[in-house]
Amino acid sequence: MIYCLETMETNYKYTIKKDPEKGILLVNEQGEVVDATDILEKCGDRRVFAFDGKMGAGKTTFIKHLCEAMGTEDVVNSPTFAIVNVYEINANRLPDELKVESLKFKGEIYHFDCYRIKDLIEAMDMGTEEYLYSGNYCFIEWAEMIEPLLPEDTVWVKIEVEENGERSLSFEV
């Protein structure tokens, strides 16, 4: 199932492949290998991304790849116990083609793992709404735990494990 807002109209689907030399590759429907930031570019000004997938589907792995493609030099790992990790974007580390104003890769990235959040009160007490409405990128695992707090234009990204073991990634904007 793909989560979407009623105003969404374009579907995107990618295959996530592992390459022994290059690491994770994102392949679009035309079979072209694209940068992970291709997803962000297609979503325009949206900054909050809710990642949906079963345990072990690759949510954290893909978010790590995405953060690195955005220019962070920080160690990206699962914030399971911290609930939120903050990564700085180093725009100087980005390739020239990604230093465009429309992508606005600057500031901080907030990476949430909401698996351990007990209820909305706990989420609000830790200041979740301040992160979500900060204008910075927010990548959220197990976002259904805080769904009522999410902005209306949140992009729901579905990661599924296919029968052949490859991962597929889909979203709508």
What are the roles of these predicted feature ranges?
Residues G56:
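Walker A (P-loop) phosphate-binding loop of P-loop NTPases
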Residues T72-Y87:
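Short beta-strand-centered segment that lines the nucleotide-binding/catalytic pocket of NTP-utilizing
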Residues F51:
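Hydrophobic anchor at the beta1->P-loop junction of P-loop NTPases
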Residues M1-T15, I89-G107, V173:
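Short, basic, low-complexity termini and linkers enriched in Ser/Thr/Gly/Pro
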Residues N11-D38:
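N-terminal pre-Walker A segment at the start of P-loop NTPase domains
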Residues Y12, K18, S102, K118-V173:
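Short phosphate-coordinating micro-motif centered on Lys-Gly-acidic
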Residues K59:
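Conserved lysine of the Walker
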